[in-house]
Amino acid sequence: MPAPRTEPRLPAIIALLAVGGIYTALPPFLTLGPRWLLLAVVGALLIPTVVSLRTGHYQLNRVLGYVVSAVITLALVVSLVLLIKALPTRAEAAPELLRSAGALWLANILVFALWYWRLDGGGPLQRDRRGAHTEGAFLFPQMTKYSKTATEDNWSPRFIDYLFIAFNMSTAFSPSDTPVLSRWAKVLTMLQSAISLIIVALLASRAIGIL
């Protein structure tokens, strides 16, 4: 029996394509191979991912989802390593370096927002099956008894909620009003904050002539 699909997947698809699009704007020294390669790979993986969801092959859909998230994560890590290795010896203009900093910083937010969305509560499919979101890796305000109303009894997080967490982790280095409960989520949030700090510190400081 097909599982109900109440959570829209379009925001996550747009985020995945946005990560690929961001990489087309990076300078060559921050990518491996052609800059359009990541976008092409993501697009190619999204086709069977969407098809498997619509045809009810949910296990395959979940595996493909992990694969595409792993691909963009690997691309982010590779770019960060290339940045650390190459930045001290390069002489790019400050505007280009600032654009690169902004691009990688934004990619970092999207990559980890996708991981939070994909892993919390068993993923979007499991959240759909349960209906009301009463437990997970993050304690959203709507899950507490003090904020529940009659209209929030069946509340469940959407991609924008995880994007909000990821944005706060990269700007304020904290999840703001959403405590992190699970160990895996704590590890991911620490990793995201560390990557954001490295990107901002290295690229921004180089751009203004500190390095």
Pin down the residues of each PLM region:
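N-terminal membrane topogenic signal
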Residues: 1-15
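Membrane-embedded alpha-helical segments in integral membrane proteins
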Residues: 16-30, 50, 82
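Pore-domain transmembrane helices of cation channels
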Residues: 87-125
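Membrane-proximal soluble regions of multi-pass membrane proteins
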Residues: 121-178
